[in-house]
Amino acid sequence: MNGTDAEPMLDTEPVLRTDYLGLHLKSPLVAAASALGESLDNILRLEDAGAAAIVLPSIFEEQILLENAALENDLTRGTESFAESLDYFPGTPSLHHEMEHYLNLIRAAKNRCEIPILASLNGATPGGWVSFAQQIEQAGADALELNTYALATGFLKTSAIIEDGLVDLVHRVRQSVQLRLAVKLSPYFTSIPHLARQMDDAGADALVLFNRFYQPDFDIENLAVVPKLTLSRPEELLLRLHWVAILYGHLRAELAVTGGVHGVEDVLKSIMAGAQVVQLASALLRHGVGHIDTLHSGLLRWMREHEYASIRQMRGSLSRRSAPDPSAFERGNYIRTLSSYTLRYKNLQQY
């Protein structure tokens, strides 16, 4: 039996309970932000299927701004001729339909569900992050995930400017709400440990690794750039495991894995690397929400077979901090891996 925290064996069912963002969860299986959480009916289906918590789809500040701009255009079209018509319409600030729909979804989910409901926010301006975070808190969300999905396309914006901006927004939101905050990061930073420590210091309660950028494809026949969405693959998990294992034990913030978690082994590897929870999206879109129960049953079966009494017992057992050979996470292992692959290739040439 392996593990960093020795526990006496229990003659009972293995314990899947875990804590995340100050919430007591029945298991580490969390439904990630996706289209599955866009309606109350689907949210209830996810709860019935065994999700320990649900992250609602991200509300994007651009959605609200674009809607308001279109509404403003509709309300003012022709008013240079009929100025009195403005008296019949309320001002646009009260007509945030997208935001109000999102807040109503939070309220409805909290009213009907027994499991925690986490909101997800992707802002475009510092003021937008703060304002929307405050409204989300007032609506009753149990926690808030800051989805820092931003592409650096400007040639004058340095990596330091981008990272300082992200840290500043976390600090601003932290100062404005009492909600527990998770920050969803991308893997494309020069020094992930340094940024993680800065996020930790700024008040992030958890880091979610990693965001997936949805990259457009090229249509060579019509000379067009077209949107393309692909589900994650299990091999994408390796990058997440690597960084969670490195960060585990060095931050106050908790760690969550999202992207590439499809099977029971993926869940186990994530926890052994140091994650508190895993977030599931592509696996549920591919296999259906009933896949949560498949993973739940598989976890219990594996833990019984390997004599683990609880999830906590295995957490971090494969982290860099617990590894007898830390070089497995560093350059030395890269060299050994290449050498091993070269040797196998030479052996194949003999046939």
Positions of PLM-derived features:
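Short, basic, glycine/proline-bearing loop/turn elements
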Residues: 23-32, 88-92, 180-182
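Alpha/beta enzyme core
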Residues: 40-61, 65-80, 97-118, 122-257, ...
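Short glycine- and Lys/Arg-enriched binding-loop motifs that mark or flank ligand-binding interfaces
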Residues: 18, 30, 115, 253-256, ...
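Glycine-rich phosphate/pyrophosphate-binding beta-alpha loops
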Residues: 33-37
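Short glycine/proline- and acidic residue-enriched helix-loop micro-motifs
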Residues: 84-93, 230
